Amino acid sequence: MLRIATLMTYGAIALALWPAESAAAETAPDGAFFAESFDDADLAKRGWYDGTQFRIVGGARAGKGCIEYEWTDAQSKVQGSSPARHLFEPSDEVAIRFYLKLSKGWGWSGRNYHPHLTHFLTTENSKWHGPAASHLTLYVEPVGGKLRLAAQDIQNAGAPHGLTQGPLRGGYNGEFYDSDEVLFGDDRWHCVEAYFKLNTLDPKRDRPNRDGIVRGWLDGRLVVDRTNVVLRSTDFPKMKFNQFLLAPYFGPGLLPHAQKLWIDELVIGGKRIGPLPAGKGSAGEAGPRE
């Protein structure tokens, strides 16, 4: 699962501009840190960084466009759009809402890990830090058709209180929180939501309290619900979530065949956001806008 190599830094941002008449990102709902509708490729002007190209196509869940990621064959790296990051106000709780569509005949890795998709990092690492070996990385992704929420903290192996997300296993560690049932099995848009809250700490006893929260929803239905989670130790009393990373990734040899995915109507906030209002739909098909 958490075997992704430390993500390389993508130099200077060079985005192709789309004409001014394209709709800008949707205004963030109340309480949101930021929102992105992917209606045009000018993400850099909306706070995104560490990305080189963005392919915006039609057939969106809402608005004029959505972002497309493509693997052209079983051996290829992700193409069309690059990974990208967005900082937000530091917070001890974070929520995400986005719409995900997988191409017809989508294939899984055949393992209990990958693909990776969306990630959160914290103030304990830099704005350029890779997700695979951090003080805490959270994952929201579909694995084997289930919704997986996960966490790793491999960089804490040498910290005074050590790892909180399980022991090292072949160079990685992680705790997984999966839906009980397979949820992704078609080529339709689905609303993916997750909410994480850092556990509190007991400084007098020098230990974490088991009150962290991990929750996930698919199309408005609660499918993951854990309220006894430890995400940090007393080594990190000032830890906050502050960075979102969008980085679809299949490890070498894990991609079954050529396929695509699309993401739309992303919102990051401090509380659960919820699905789009009923009736807010696509603006129709269009060609790519890179």
Please give the residue ranges for each predicted region:
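Carbohydrate-binding surfaces in secreted/extracellular proteins
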Residues: 191-230
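Extracellular glycan-recognition surfaces and repeat-rich motifs
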Residues: 42-70
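Extracellular carbohydrate recognition
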Residues: 208-210, 253-265, 274, 278
